[in-house]
From Swiss-Prot:
It is found in: Nucleus. The keyword Protease does not apply. The lineage of its organism: Eukaryota, Viridiplantae, Streptophyta, Embryophyta, Tracheophyta. This is Zinc finger CCCH domain-containing protein 67. InterPro entries: Plant_ZF_CCCH, Znf_CCCH, Znf_CCCH_sf. GO terms for molecular function: DNA binding; mRNA binding; zinc ion binding. One of its GO terms (cellular component) is nucleus. Keywords: DNA-binding, Metal-binding, Nucleus, Repeat, Zinc, Zinc-finger. Residues 1-91, 235-274, 412-435 are annotated as: Disordered. Residues 247-256 have a biased composition (Low complexity).
Length: 435
């Protein structure tokens, strides 16, 4: 039996890397004898078997990496998201996620919230029962809130307006028996009077309050306070003004003058707000000398009688007294401020108690030696007649006017009636004489 010729390897230096393993196996099998084929097949089967085992081992040896960023989410992914499991299973999972270290200190964050962001790497103790106790406490508090919803006091019930929900309110109205006088007393403006509280600053400056009866501050009644130092009529810089005192003085002077008449008939009194025919007050500062007559003296339907003219001196003296007292009260003294130049010149100031300058009382201009007529206008015989007063019977300057406001000497009731008759005959309409 002849041996097969051995062929020399064309590449003695080593295997060609470009040739695959299958080519090498084919060449080897072709060159070998048939008796060696069984041995080669066994080697190939062993290699294939080992390759499958290595792949399966690699698949089994892949580590399961769990990130530590969100332990609670990872625990749900590992152990399921069902929240209705039994306590034993939840305790086991808690032990796996959060370490129990009896020798260490309790984790403060875990004791408060029932969770820990460090998870199994935390070095503190995590009692297993803590999270379960927190859940039970929350459920218990929720049940208590449902059973007792009226644990908090209703903040609207104890105000003046009360609670609009009434008995259906979910908050407590339990102080109704303990505080029967919860509704405060109201002043004449309908604002609450609270003696123990601080005075409402807006009300003390302006006399009104936008909060109304719900305001928690005190709103004293100015009629009960009275006096010159009433805080309701304070100026911007501390000055005070109370119109109550002048009104009382004026009412006293008018009443005393009324009783001075010996005939028993009340004399003519210049009213501050008269209701004469054809006159309608249009402003709050409408004065008596402006609204006392809307017609010329020769056309006035109510001509003054002789006793009214005779008693005018008594009326003017009381009016001048009232005016002087009012000027003293309504102009504030502010020693730390500059003096009001207009007040020093004229004795008057249009800002009155709101003026921020000083109004010294001892430097008031001297009262001129003249009297006033029955309308409160000055009688200055040495001056010319006031044209506005001679035409219309009123003067917008009032007592400060520098002209004369005496009754025209040609005035008489008969002449006024004659003038009226002429106008009625000429126009043919009685109403034309009044317009």
């Amino acid at each position: 039996m002849s041996k097969p010729e051995e062929t020399s390897d064309p590449n003695p230096t080593g295997p060609d890397p470009s040739r695959s393993s299958s080519d090498e196996v084919t060449v080897t099998v072709a060159d070998r004898a048939p008796s060696d084929l069984n041995h080669v097949s066994e080697e190939l089967s062993d290699q294939l078997r080992n390759v499958g085992l290595d792949d399966s081992a690699k698949e089994l040896s892949v580590p399961i990496s769990v990130p530590q960023g969100n332990v609670e989410t990872d625990s749900r992914a590992l152990f399921g998201s069902d929240q209705k499991e039994e306590e034993e299973g939840s305790e086991k999972r808690m032990m796996m996620v959060y370490p129990v270290r009896p020798d260490s200190e309790d984790c403060s964050f875990y004791m408060r919230t029932g969770s820990c962001k460090y998870g199994s790497s935390c070095k503190f103790n995590h009692p297993v029962r803590r999270k379960l106790q927190i859940g039970r406490e929350r459920v218990r508090e929720r049940d208590e809130d449902v059973e007792n919803p009226k644990l908090m006091e209703c903040k609207y019930y104890f105000r003046t307006g009360g609670c609009k929900y009434g008995e259906s309110c979910r908050f407590s109205h339990m102080k109704e028996h303990n505080s029967p006088a919860s509704v405060p007393e109201l002043n004449f403006l309908g604002l609450p009077i609270r003696p123990g509280e601080k005075e409402c600053p807006f009300y003390m400056r302006n006399g009104s309050c936008k909060f109304g009866s719900d305001c928690k501050f005190n709103h004293p009644d100015p009629t009960a306070i009275g006096g010159v130092d009433s805080p309701l009529y304070r100026g911007n810089n501390g000055g005070s003004f109370s119109p109550k005192a002048p009104s009382q003085a004026s009412s006293t002077s008018w009443s005393s003058t009324r009783h001075m008449n010996g005939t028993g008939t009340a004399p003519f009194i210049p009213s501050m707000f008269p209701h004469s025919r054809g006159v309608t007050p249009q402003a709050s500062d409408w004065n008596g000398y402006q609204a006392s007559s809307a017609y010329p003296p020769e056309r006035s339907p109510l001509a003054p009688s002789s006793y009214q003219v005779n008693n005018s001196l008594a009326e003017t003296s009381s009016f001048s007294q009232y005016q002087h007292q009012m000027s003293v009260e309504e102009f504030p003294e502010r020693p730390d401020q500059p003096e009001c130049t207009y007040y020093l010149k004229t004795g008057d100031c249009k800002f009155k108690y709101k003026c921020k300058y000083h109004h010294p009382k001892n430097r008031l201009p001297k009262q001129a030696a003249f009297s006033f007529n029955d309308k409160g206008l000055p009688l200055r015989p040495d001056q010319s007649m006031c044209t506005h007063y001679s035409r219309y019977g009123i003067c917008k300057f009032g007592p400060a006017c520098r002209f004369d406001h005496s009754i025209p000497p040609t005035f008489s009731p008969s002449s006024s009636q004659t003038v009226e008759a002429r106008q009625v005959g000429a126009n043919g309409n009685e109403d034309d004489s009044w317009h």
